[in-house]
Amino acid sequence: MTTIAIIGAGAMGSAVAGRLTQRGARVVTRLEGRSEASCARALTAGMQDASFEDMAAAALVLSIVPPAAAPEVVEELAPLFAMPSPPPLCDANACNPQTKRRLAARVAELGGQMVDGAIIGPPPSDTADPRLYLSGEGAEEIAALTKFGIDARVLKGPLGAAAALKMCYGGINKGGIALTTALLLAAERNGAADDLVAELAVTQKPLLERSRRQIPDMYPKASRWNPEMLEIAGFLEPDDPAAAAIWRALARFYAERARADEAGIELPVLEALLQT
C-alpha cells in the first residue's frame, strides 16, 4: 500500500486525505501540537498519526496549510529531511513564487527536495475535483497522485510556475468577489441597493448568480483570504507596484470582512439583498 504524508488537516487537507484513503492510499500525518478540531478532522478523514520515522517511508509529503504557516511546516519537517533519502515535499499552499523559491532553498539546506504545488478549486467531494498544479524538478513524481483520484497536472515552467498560476487565478477570483461585495455594501449605505441588484439582474445576470453563491461563502473564509491577498501583492510588487497596492488594499478589505463576520453584521444584509 502506498503511504502519503499530509501536513494540514483543514477543510482542504482533510478532504484530500479522504479522497486518497478512499482510493486505497494510507495517509499519515503529525498530530502533535494540533488543535482538537484538526485532530478530529484528520481522524475522520482516515489520517493516521505518525512519527518522522513512519513518514520517511511515505512516497511524498503534501503541505496544505495557510500560507503564513508554510515556513513553519518546513522547519517542523527538518528531522525528516535529515534522514537518508527523505520523501519529496510538495508545498501546495497559496504562496507566491518568491516565497516558494525561498522555501525550496531552505528545504534543500535541510537535505530535502521541494516541488511547487497549487490547488485550484474547492475541496474534493462527490461533486468537486480540484486541480493540483505542479512545477519544478520532481513534479512528475508528485503527479503519481492521479492514480489516487487527485487531478494532478504538471506545468512546463520552473519551480514557481504553479504558484504564479495560483496567484493570478486567485487574484481574479477573489478580487472580483471583493469588488462586488464592496459595491453592494456601498449601494446599501446610499439607498441604491435594490436598484443595483435589479440592474444586475438585467445586464449582469451571471455575475449576480455567482455573487449569490460566492459572497455568503466568502465571509467565513475572509480571515484566510487576507494573507493570500498579501502573497499576491508580493508577487506583483517587483514588476507592477500599482497593481500590488490594489491587492494590499484587498487584504485590508478581507480583514474588515472577517471582523464583520465575527460581529454577525453585513452578511445578513447582503444575503437578504441578493435573494431579492
Where are these regions (language model features)?
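NAD(P)+-binding Rossmann beta1-loop-alpha1 motif at the extreme N-terminus of oxidoreductases
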Residues: M1-A56
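Rossmann-fold dinucleotide-binding core
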Residues: I4, C95-K174
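Conserved beta-strand segments of alpha/beta enzyme cores
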Residues: R26, G46-Q48, P88, Q113, ...
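Rossmann-like NAD(P)-binding element
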Residues: A50-C95
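Helical "substrate-binding/catalytic lid" subdomain
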Residues: L165-E266
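Short, basic/aromatic-enriched C-terminal tail that caps enzymatic domains
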Residues: G264-T276
